Regions:
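Short, glycine-/small-residue-rich phosphate/pyrophosphate-handling segment
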Residues: 1-4
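Non-transmembrane, aqueous-exposed alpha-helical and coiled segments at domain scale
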Residues: 8, 12, 16, 28-287
């Protein structure tokens, strides 16, 4: 079995030296530029190799064979060699091909590619501060929220247990983004990822917004896009905290939210941050 895998190279050093981006040429007839690694035709052997080379999140992966990667690339018109951006903290070049490789490993389908490319563009934007998020001792994870027609097309979960298990698109998109952050950004746990304890959201953290039952503007519309557009939003999230109130009075719901948010010893209280609230339809309707 031929497993396509990215080279473990110090891309930042190569960029400083003016060298290439560290993507080795594959076989001449492959049409792909990633390094080709020959592996025994056995799923366990592939996963053992990937674990040894720290190319996984610790869970089994789908072997990114040439055929699977080429099929994944069919999900976008963008060229495989196009560099979307450099992913901190290792500043590896996130080519469309590399995004596709990690998407295959995570179990994505080709229709996921536009979402993943947009997510990479978002996390690499300067205002997101991916360097800080990836290298901090804080257990922060990247939360991916999807809006618009693409969320419907992928049948993403925006309802009960939307941040939990059970939905293929939520799970594979979130996992693919994490693999990109680790494999392209080189945020290896205990090396460049310095999280003291981490959190489960660092495996995957992805959902869609329930636009139909949202009494306010959809998130992407609130942030300047059109209602009919597809969009992704990325958030640096520490984790989830449940707020328990059965009140039907708006002021009481807001009081509970404020009391829960205070967290006097938390990072946001001490250094600032943007609270991120997720309301159930029942509470949103009251407010």
């Amino acid at each position: 079995m031929r497993a396509l895998a990215e080279q473990s190279v110090d891309n930042l050093l190569k960029l400083v030296k003016g060298e290439d981006d560290g993507v080795a040429a594959a076989e001449e007839d492959s049409g792909l530029r990633a390094k080709t690694t020959l592996v025994e035709d056995d799923l366990e052997a592939v996963n053992r190799l990937f674990r040894e080379r720290k190319w996984t999140d610790g869970l089994p992966v789908v072997p990114p064979t040439r055929e699977r990667v080429e099929a994944m690339l069919a999900g976008t018109p963008r060229k495989p060699e196009e560099v979307i951006d450099l992913v901190a903290p290792g500043f590896g070049a996130a080519t469309v091909e590399r995004i596709a490789i990690n998407a295959v490993m995570a179990g994505c389908e080709p229709a996921c590619m536009p979402v993943l490319i947009a997510a990479v563009e978002a996390v690499c934007s300067p205002e997101f501060n991916l360097q800080g998020i990836q290298a901090t001792t804080n257990p922060v994870a990247v939360w991916l929220i999807v809006n618009g027609p693409v969320a419907k097309a992928l049948d993403m979960n925006a309802g009960p247990n939307c941040l939990g298990q059970g939905n293929w698109a939520n799970a594979t998109l979130g996992r693919a983004l994490r693999l990109i952050l680790q494999n392209v950004g080189r945020a290896l746990p205990g090396v460049m990822d310095r999280a003291t304890h981490g959190q489960p959201g660092k495996y995957l953290f992805c959902c869609a917004e329930n636009e139909e039952e949202n009494p306010w503007e959809a998130l992407h519309v609130e942030r300047g896009l059109e209602a009919g557009q597809s969009a992704v939003t990325v958030v640096g999230a520490e984790g989830t905290t449940n707020m328990n109130t059965h009140s039907k009075i708006a002021a009481e719901i807001i009081r509970v939210v404020a009391e829960t948010m205070k967290r006097p010893a938390g990072n946001d209280y001490r250094t600032g941050g943007e609270p991120w609230l997720v309301f159930s339809p029942e509470h949103a309707d009251v407010l």
